[in-house]
Amino acid sequence: MKLILLGPPGAGKGTQAEILNKKLNIPTISTGNILRAAVKNGTPVGLQAKAYMDAGKLVPDEVIIGVISERLAEADCQNGFILDGVPSTIPQAEALEKVGITFDAVVSLEISDEEIVERMGGRRVCASCGAPFHVKNLPPKVEGVCDACGGKLEARADDKPEVVRDRLKVYHKETAPLKDFYAARNLLKTVENQPTVAETTTAILKALGL
């Protein structure tokens, strides 16, 4: 199954993607991770991306789409994948269509702005392996310690309320219009935020008919 996960920052896309890739046995493809991997591996589009990143510039859509196309051509993506964080704009969605990348469903996680602000204040990330946690919704077994690798859990600077509100403004302007874009293609599955991570996963699987 080829999926896109949509939703505002802090909606739990990363957490749900990790759960779904284990349940469905398909990889999660996040923009940040594949950009870093392409740069590290020195692929042609990775080198292009590195030039922009080193200059402190935004990586243009055509390079991002190139990196994604490169990643989706790998063997582990042939039975499906989950895209997290891309497309983030209508032009990116159109570019994916143009290069022939198709999807079975687009899941939009729905949650209010106020709940996002509260939720993101409780997020923690492992400084060593990047595993996500939350002080309330997904706490580690030992406070401040990563379950996976024993690394130190940290709050992110961009989870401060004023920063979150700015990011939400960008989301509503740039990314939220993708819901109409994919609804017009009969791909959109809307999933309301649930009280727990597990309940949200169940709602996603139900929306997908799984």
Pin down the residues of each PLM region.
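Glycine-rich phosphate-binding loop of ATP-dependent small-molecule kinases
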Residues: M1-L210
